[in-house]
């Protein structure tokens, strides 16, 4: 009997083991040794959202049904909460240990426009709860083939110069208020009828939440699902270890304010593969904030491979926060089409740090609006409504955190169409951009091949070919 049970147990584990083994194929022929991810495993328990009172009619609020389903699984040690076919209106969802949120193919989770549902009671924070969160959890996942929609147009400001007349009219028909001589629209006093949660549109805008934010978690999986229309960032693991992003789609309007797609903030051991991004801000982004006690710091051991990025401010982005360091990042075999920039390294005084062992190879790009490759050391965050011409000032403490882009190796890049091929500018008197090599790269149909400030940067170009449509200036 014991032998039979062992055989059955092994058979039940086989698919997970096989899937885990599949991830090893991505780690072949790496230019640097890095820790590999392992797929989280979950108990075989399953709860269907309908069985705990859920109604997928697009009208009924299912916040309590999600809570009941997760609580029921938690008491059993974890398992899968299945969201079946339907449109499931809900407030915030909080995942627990060993919980897999699974969306069937025709399932849409649609987050309520009622902002009151997201306010953290008794909190003095200027932020609200993410649409989906997990905090200090082990083994959490969002999987399946459905859609998760953050209803972001109820939260995001809109700049007039980023929309057509028809789109601007549509926003005004939702309600809202125009500011700054009609150049900015805020979702304030909306016709949806739900009350605002702050006493001014500017204050409320600062409370925008992420669609998915996992903090201080271990063993995280995002697989198959479409994440769209976030109030702010879409998929945002922070201070997490062992994070897998496999085969997801992230999409939002091209003009979505702060509409980052996939942001790894201070994460260790991660994999982003087979995913597609079409976003309003950064595409595949690595961030590293200032060190915190009792928390993961820096971003390291991240493999990014076989992904496609359409619109984004940058397809692969490092920064702007790099303070705790960025180590052992490999980006390869990715496609960028129609992004503002291709490979974007951005940081600034007060948020900068050191990069180590970054390898980027076999990247193809087309129709890049600005730079194919850019190093920027004077980045300043400018929220909607701020003065774009304001000159920043820095304290001595902030000056300690200067960008240090180094030990970066880029090869086998082909780009057709960019305003500038390679742009790099450091900060005079600081060694911000150095020991970087770009090899075996072809950039054609540019207005300018390169714009490199030799006084502040040290780049080595080898076998790099440019071709311009217009005479270089």
Residue ranges and their predicted role:
Residues 55-57, 290-295, 324-325, 351:
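Short, small-residue-enriched loops and turns at beta-alpha junctions
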Residues 105-106, 138-146, 218-228, 241-253, ...:
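Right-handed parallel beta-helix
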Residues 83-91, 261-263, 292, 348-349, ...:
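Conserved short loop/turn motifs at secondary-structure junctions
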Residues 322, 342-473:
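Extracellular beta-rich repeat passengers
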Residues 78, 92, 112-113, 151-155, ...:
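Short glycine/acidic-rich loop motifs that flank beta-strands on beta-rich extracellular proteins
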Residues 2-82, 87-100, 104-216, 221-223, ...:
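Extracellular "leader-to-stem" segments immediately downstream of a signal peptide or signal-anchor
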Residues 87, 239, 249, 288-290, ...:
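Active-site-proximal loop/turn and secondary-structure-junction residues that shape catalytic pockets
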């Amino acid at each position: 009997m014991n032998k039979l049970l062992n055989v059955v147990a092994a058979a039940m584990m086989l698919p997970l083991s096989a899937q885990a083994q599949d991830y090893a194929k991505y780690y072949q022929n790496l230019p640097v040794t890095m820790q590999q991810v392992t797929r989280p495993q979950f108990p075989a328990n399953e709860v269907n959202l309908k069985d705990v009172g859920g109604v997928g009619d697009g009208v009924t609020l299912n916040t309590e049904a999600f809570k009941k389903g997760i609580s029921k699984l938690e008491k059993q040690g974890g398992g899968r909460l299945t969201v079946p076919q339907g449109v499931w209106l809900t407030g915030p969802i909080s995942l627990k240990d060993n919980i897999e949120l699974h969306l069937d193919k025709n399932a849409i989770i649609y987050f309520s426009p009622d902002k009151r549902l997201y306010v953290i009671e008794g909190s003095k924070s200027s932020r609200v709860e993410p649409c989906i969160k997990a905090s200090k959890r082990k083994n959490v996942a969002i999987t399946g083939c459905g859609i998760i929609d953050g209803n972001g147009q109820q939260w995001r400001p809109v700049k007039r110069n980023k929309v057509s007349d028809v789109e601007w009219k549509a926003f005004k028909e939702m309600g809202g208020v125009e500011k700054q001589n009609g150049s900015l629209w805020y979702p304030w006093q909306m016709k949806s009828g739900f009350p605002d949660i702050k006493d001014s549109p500017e204050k409320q805008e600062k409370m925008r939440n992420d669609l998915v934010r996992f903090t201080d978690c271990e063993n995280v999986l995002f697989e198959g699902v479409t994440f769209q229309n976030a109030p702010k960032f879409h998929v945002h693991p922070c201070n997490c270890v062992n994070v897998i992003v496999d085969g997801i789609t992230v999409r939002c309007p091209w003009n979505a304010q702060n509409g980052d797609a996939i942001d790894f903030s201070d994460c260790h051991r991660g994999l982003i593969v087979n995913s597609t991004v079409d976003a309003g801000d950064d595409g595949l982004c690595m961030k590293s904030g200032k060190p915190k006690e009792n928390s993961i710091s820096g971003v390291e051991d991240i493999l990014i491979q076989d992904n496609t990025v359409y619109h984004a401010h940058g397809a692969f982005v490092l920064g702007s926060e790099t303070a705790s360091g960025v180590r052992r990042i490999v980006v390869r075999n990715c496609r960028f089409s129609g992004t503002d920039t291709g490979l974007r390294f951005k940081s600034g005084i007060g948020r900068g740090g050191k990069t180590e062992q970054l390898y980027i190879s076999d990247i193809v790009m087309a129709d890049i609006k600005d730079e194919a490759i850019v190093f920027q050391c004077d980045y300043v965050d400018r929220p909607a409504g701020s003065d774009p011409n304001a000159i920043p000032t820095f304290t001595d403490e902030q000056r300690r955190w200067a960008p240090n882009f180094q030990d970066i190796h880029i090869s086998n890049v082909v780009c057709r169409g960019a305003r500038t091929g390679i742009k790099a500018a450091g900060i005079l008197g600081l060694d911000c951009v150095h020991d970087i090599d770009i090899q075996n790269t072809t950039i054609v149909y540019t207005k300018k091949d390169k714009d490199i400030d030799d006084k502040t940067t040290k780049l080595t170009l080898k076998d790099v070919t440019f071709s311009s449509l217009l005479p270089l200036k």
